[in-house]
Amino acid sequence: AILQKPAADNGVLPLLSVDEASLSFTYSMADDDKVYGLGENVRGINKRGWIYQSKCSDEPEHLEDRRSLYGAHNFFVVTGKETFGIFVDYPGILTFDIGYTRYSELKITASDWNLDVYVITGTDVKDIVHQFRQLIGRSFVVPKWAFGYGQSRWSYMSEDEIRDVVKKHRELQIPLDSVY
C-alpha cells in the first residue's frame, strides 16, 4: 500500500524501456552493476544472474532453483553506472530476469498493465531506501520475543507433542522463545 501516492506521470519512465507487447520493462546493466532487494529469497545478496518471481509461496524445499519464497517484495536497488531503486506496486505475478537470459539486461515482466512503477533516484542507496520507506510507510517492528529462537515444523499433532518439544529443549539447555 502506498501512503501518499505521488501524482501520476504517464510519460516515459526514466532508465527503463517499455515493451507494451510483452508487458515488460527493461534496463541495460553495465558489467559491474549489482542488484539488491526483492525480499526473502534463496541465493546471494546480489540478485544478478538469476530469475525471481514475485508471488507468495511457502514451499517446503528451499532449493536454489526456487524463484519465489514466502512473500512478494517488489522493490530492488541497482548500484553501478547508475544508482536507483524500482518499486512495482502490483498484486499479480511479476518476473524479474536479472541478467539471467542476458547478463547485460534486467527485465521485469507482468501479466497485465494494472500496475504502478516507481523509479526512485537519490544520492545513495540509503537515500533511495529512505524515499521508498516514505512511500510505503514505516516497517513493522516485531515484539522482542520474536528475535529469539522459535522452533517450527510442518505439524504438531497434539498439545502433548508440543510440551515434549519444550521439555527436550530444556533438557538440552537450548534456549526457546516460541513454538509454532
Over which residues does each language-model region extend?
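Catalytic and substrate-binding clefts that recognize carbohydrates or anionic sugar/phosphate headgroups
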Residues: 1-144, 153-154, 166-168
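Aromatic-lined carbohydrate-binding/catalytic grooves of carbohydrate-active enzymes
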Residues: 140-180
